[in-house]
């Protein structure tokens, strides 16, 4: 009997991947998210939407992004051959524009005038502000004060693109609070605005929608890898915060005999509050409108988290990642702040590519894996470039010494 392809089977109609996902919302928002879900199913299949998105990706974003054999990185590891999917070369410097242009296009079809969202590292904020400028919409981005200080170049970019940046000054003042703040702003104006969630998290239909919009990464990479090597990679490695870049590249390979590695931020240590490795240390819980694995305090509230990468600093993970982890289809592994920074410099010095600190987590684990897997092929999703991080890294860690 032929099995239905994974992507056509999950999530179910209610937005569940196994027991994870769903839409846990206040009554006022249920109808609005239902409207987005129904519109998405209808509009995303329409010829006009598909053609316009294809054209945007090719002529505006510069897709497909290249697949690159990292020769010197591979030599340094001394085992497997390492290939990079260059999402750092997507317009705005990360994978985020893949779903932002599509979310804005959907908003246009729905007659919405305003895009509201949260951002951690600022990449989603920049990408959404870019999409808003392209389509002539208003844009409001909520960002924790800690991240505003750390990712200042992206704050300037957002403002230059015409977005309003709302500083979030409560709680930890990072990504979780930015989501809370953005949700509140959206609650005030759901008729005119769309909450353009920045990852494969949040209430249904967002985990499915963002995955589908990001699946272009995996589809391209698969075709490029077959063309370049004649076979599929043995391993795919991607960093996981909420998990949009990882789901984007994993999506094309779930039904194939390829090992999938999701790299979480181990931060400074294993104690609660020192890391943001939800799959490794979390338990089931509901936050931000979806059921998943999350890091929680004893009372069940979301725990404090830490990562050197603002974009990974989130106490939960996309429900699809929780499901794939639970059924053993993906491996959840971790990389510390220190290892990430070391590999931030390694990629810069060995290949002339400065990665985002988030992506440096994937490089770090890919290097570790490569040392153990002689003769195998590893594909790492290089989810973004490090322009946003150079001030922070140079001020905090210097210039990395000699490689």
From Swiss-Prot:
Keyword Amino-acid biosynthesis in record: yes
PROSITE patterns recorded: TRP_SYNTHASE_BETA
Positions carrying N6-(pyridoxal phosphate)lysine: 96
Family matches, as CDD domains: Trp-synth_B
Gene3D superfamilies: 3.40.50.1100
Gene: trpB1
Free-text function comment from the UniProt entry: The beta subunit is responsible for the synthesis of L-tryptophan from indole and L-serine.
Name of this chain's protein: Tryptophan synthase beta chain 1
EC number per UniProt: 4.2.1.20
GO CC annotations on file: cytoplasm
SUPFAM superfamilies the record matches: Tryptophan synthase beta subunit-like PLP-dependent enzymes
Entry's family note: Belongs to the TrpB family.
Complex and partners: Tetramer of two alpha and two beta chains.
GO MF annotation list: tryptophan synthase activity
